[in-house]
Amino acid sequence: MTNIVWHQHPVDQAARAEQKGQNPVLLWFTGLSGAGKSTLAGALERALFEAGFHTYLLDGDNVRHGLCKDLGFTVEDRDENLRRVGEVAKLMVDAGLVVLSAFISPTREERDGIRARFPAGQFIEVHVSTPLSVCEQRDPKGLYVKARSGEISNFTGISSPYEAPLAAELTIDTSKGDLATQVRALIDYLTAINVINTDKTKTVA
């Protein structure tokens, strides 16, 4: 590593952010499988995109088709999966984007490690706190059935623990209220902390 030096770009994050009319951040959606992370993050991205903001959504399943296709589901591989995602998200934030990441990310240590890579205020933890009973009832991928039968081991919430955030910036239970109201709450929060400007957010339903 001694011969590797960080190359400073002629265009920095502040200039990219100014061009896009937004302050780049990473919104990290964490919660159990079936909690509604991807649905909520996807709906927020659609609303922001339609209002003219520059976004990208990193989804837990999607990154395993390419970036992390060589990884399994051991503790070590899960840690590496999130490490890679955190690094990619950091590059995207540096590019001036509002980045949304939807990952179970079950441990506080993992999430806090990613938070530590960002300046204060650029990592926004969104705890999708939908109860296990609701997630298991939804079971969109049939994973809980397999976990209960022993077909899947180390499944978060069943045979492996989920550590809920102690101080998430936002907490949303998708079993309460409708999706539009939940997205509106996220938009209002991003506006309040000056990630996005009010002129554009007036166009967001």
Swiss-Prot record:
The active site is at residue 105. One of its GO terms (biological process) is hydrogen sulfide biosynthetic process. This is Adenylyl-sulfate kinase. GO terms for molecular function: adenylylsulfate kinase activity; ATP binding. The gene is cysC. ATP binds at residues 31-38. Pathway: Sulfur metabolism; hydrogen sulfide biosynthesis; sulfite from sulfate: step 2/3. The keyword RNA-binding does not apply. Its EC number is 2.7.1.25. It catalyses: adenosine 5'-phosphosulfate + ATP = 3'-phosphoadenylyl sulfate + ADP + H(+). Gene3D superfamilies: P-loop containing nucleotide triphosphate hydrolases (3.40.50.300). Belongs to the APS kinase family. CDD domains: APSK. Catalyzes the synthesis of activated sulfate. Keywords: ATP-binding, Kinase, Nucleotide-binding, Phosphoprotein, Transferase.
